[in-house]
UniProtKB/Swiss-Prot annotation:
Main location: membrane
NCBIfam families: tatC
Gene Ontology molecular functions: proton motive force dependent protein transmembrane transporter activity
Family to which the UniProt record says this protein belongs: Belongs to the TatC family.
Pfam family name, one: TatC
Name recorded for this polypeptide: Sec-independent protein translocase protein TatC
The organism of origin for this protein: Rickettsia prowazekii (strain Madrid E)
Length: 251
């Protein structure tokens, strides 16, 4: 463990922050240049469900489209530089950590971006098509005055970002559980006994983070339960050597 003065810590923090900011600006500029393609990609779930139906995405404010593309570029840039942020955070705090603490932090910062991306991929390819199909079922084209969807460009992006962030954060569940187990705050046996409570909590979280339709809630709750069970298996592997070591010392 290395000891630094406050000024050295502050200088190091500024350098790390500057690197993150520089990376963000560069990636943001690239994303803004390709923002049309990125937005078209996000529209794919809706476009595939529409088939031959002509679908319009509108904007009702003069600056709405511009600021929507700015928001899209910023969000895309942030999701891309998550590993850079994680690396810079690790390099900043690692000199002040013990070896076992470094392993825990490295595990968290390595797995967190991966799980976030897994959640994003899952929601985009599996949840959004089902959710969009549900919402499109409210269209009534055969009525005297047809009811059709003409989504606003900003509202559509806000919903997509909301879902990606919700699933990305929810997929961090294994990290939280495993770290608590490593710190000996939560035991595997406790996780097994509290399964029913975990099921209820997962559905509550899903209800808060997802749109109000039941399909989206189940689409998040079920993966969370699978992640919970996976966490139990991993925690069991972590605890087994620890238990054997205690028994060996007692003998």
């Amino acid at each position: 463990m290395k000891l630094y003065s406050f000024q050295e810590h502050l200088l190091e923090f500024k350098i790390r922050l500057l690197r993150i900011f520089t990376a963000f600006i560069i990636i943001f500029a690239i994303c803004y240049y390709f923002s049309d393609y990125i937005y078209s990609f996000l529209l794919e779930p809706l476009a595939k469900l529409s088939g031959d139906t002509v679908r319009n995405i509108i904007y009702t404010g003069l600056t709405e489209a511009f600021f929507t593309y700015i928001k899209l570029s910023a969000f895309t840039a942030f999701t891309i530089i998550i590993p850079i942020i994680a690396l810079e955070c690790y390099l900043f705090i690692s000199p002040g950590l013990y070896r076992h603490e470094k392993k825990i932090i490295a595990f968290i910062l390595f797995m967190s971006p991966i799980l976030f991306w897994c959640g994003s991929i899952f929601v985009f390819y599996f949840v959004m098509p089902k959710a969009w199909n549900f919402f499109l079922s409210f269209e009534k084209r055969d009525m005297i005055v047809p009811i059709i969807l003409e989504a606003r460009i900003s509202e559509y992006l806000n919903l997509v970002i909301h879902l990606i962030i919700a699933f990305g954060i929810a997929f961090q569940l294994p990290i939280v559980i495993i770290v608590l187990n490593i710190l000996k705050i939560v035991k595997t046996q406790t996780l097994k006994k509290k399964r029913r409570i975990a099921v209820v909590i997962n559905f509550i979280i899903a209800g808060i983070l997802t749109p109000p339709d039941i399909l989206s809630q189940f689409a998040l709750a079920i993966p969370l339960l699978l992640l919970y069970e996976t966490s139990i298996i991993i925690c069991n592997f972590i605890e087994t050597p620890r238990t054997l070591n205690v028994k060996y010392q007692m003998d």
